[in-house]
């Protein structure tokens, strides 16, 4: 039984590292998406029929629609940083993985990181690698409100 537990633990660690590295790559391209080549590379991480649910922005039903919003509202305006210690990865048997955590958004012009939100992504494992099929971005709030809640 301990061999199985060790194998499962190793598989979980490999999955965590894989998805964490992919998340970092997705958002490295997102953070540089004012460059059209980086926006296209960012696009490659998402399924054509990706569904993106945003608590304040609504729903998009395709990669093209999502990218149009990214180009219009995000590229050159702000970047994303994952909040250390919040990232989690869970396997989805026979499909892929679910990742979740908290991220902050930083204004490009001022370098101020005043927005926080929670996220969940569904990753599908395919022969050619991994692709994101669903994104939930929710709980958008100001970073100062979040730190005030954490204070005694």
Q: For each predicted feature, which ranges?
A:
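Short, low-complexity N-terminal intrinsically disordered segments enriched in polar/charged residues
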Residues: 1-48, 144-152
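Short, well-ordered beta-strand segments in beta-rich or mixed alpha/beta enzyme
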Residues: 46, 51-55, 96-107, 120-122
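Solvent-exposed loop/turn segments at secondary-structure junctions
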Residues: 57-59, 104-106, 138-142
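Short beta-strand edge/turn micro-motifs at domain boundaries
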Residues: 1-3, 116-143
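A solvent-exposed, acidic/Ser-Thr-rich amphipathic alpha-helical stretch
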Residues: 36-95, 113
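Hydrophobic/aromatic beta-strand elements that line small-molecule binding cavities or substrate pockets
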Residues: 66, 70, 84-90, 102-105, ...
């Amino acid at each position: 039984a301990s061999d199985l537990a060790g194998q499962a633990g190793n598989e979980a660690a490999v999955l965590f590292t894989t998805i964490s590295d992919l998340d970092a790559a997705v958002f490295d391209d997102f953070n540089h998406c004012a460059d059209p080549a980086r926006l296209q590379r960012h696009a490659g991480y998402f399924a054509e029929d990706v569904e993106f649910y945003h608590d304040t922005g609504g729903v998009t039903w395709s990669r093209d629609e999502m990218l149009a919003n990214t180009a219009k509202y995000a590229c050159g305006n702000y970047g994303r940083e994952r909040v250390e210690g919040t990232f989690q990865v869970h396997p989805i048997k026979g499909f892929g993985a679910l990742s979740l955590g908290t991220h902050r958004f930083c204004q490009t012009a001022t370098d101020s990181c005043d927005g926080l939100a929670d996220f969940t992504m569904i990753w599908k494992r395919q022969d050619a690698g991994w692709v994101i099929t669903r994104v939930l971005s929710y709980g958008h709030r100001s970073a100062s409100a979040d730190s005030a809640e954490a204070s005694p």
